[in-house]
Amino acid sequence: MSSELFDPKPLVEIKEAYRKNKKFIRHHSDRYKRVKPSWRRPHGIDSKVRKRCKGEREMPSIKYKKPKEIRHLLPNGLRKVRIFNINDLTPLTSLNRFYCGEIAHAVGARKRIAIVNRAKELGICLLNGNARLIPEIEE
């Protein structure tokens, strides 16, 4: 992976692009209380929304996709990489300006502590670095 490919855009541009995104609400959710606003694709044979008639609600489509440079970016401007063991941290040492790690759910407590300590040594940002860590009991 070359760093010029993943040059992070300024956060202002990212937030500006995400501000433009359209909220799609379900057809007739404003008309009936029983119809919740979360998007469902219309399937009716005479549905004006499904037929894409003029003046009706827009349906989600490929034209609303985000630009490639900012797709999958987190609010801090980094991309997320899942980490399963300590060896997954080594590629992130040179790319820690562009990527941050997220420890996978299946990783146990012993490995999780080792990953967190190694990430601190290497200066890698972890999204869930303090999640599910068992504090050591002093005797």
From Swiss-Prot:
Gene Ontology BP term (one): translation
Query: Which Gene Ontology cellular component annotation is one that this UniProt entry carries?
Result: cytosolic large ribosomal subunit
Keywords from UniProt, A to Z, are: Ribonucleoprotein, Ribosomal protein
Under SMART domains, the record lists: Ribosomal_L32e
Query: The organism sits in which domain of life?
Result: Eukaryota
What PROSITE patterns does this protein's entry cite? Answer: RIBOSOMAL_L32E
What molecular functions are annotated in GO for this chain?
A: structural constituent of ribosome
Disulfide bridge partners, by residue number: none
Q: Does the keyword Transmembrane helix apply?
A: no
Q: Pfam families under this entry?
A: Ribosomal_L32e
Query: To which protein family does this belong?
Result: Belongs to the eukaryotic ribosomal protein eL32 family.
The protein's name is Large ribosomal subunit protein eL32
Q: Which organism is it from?
A: Encephalitozoon cuniculi (strain GB-M1) (Microsporidian parasite)
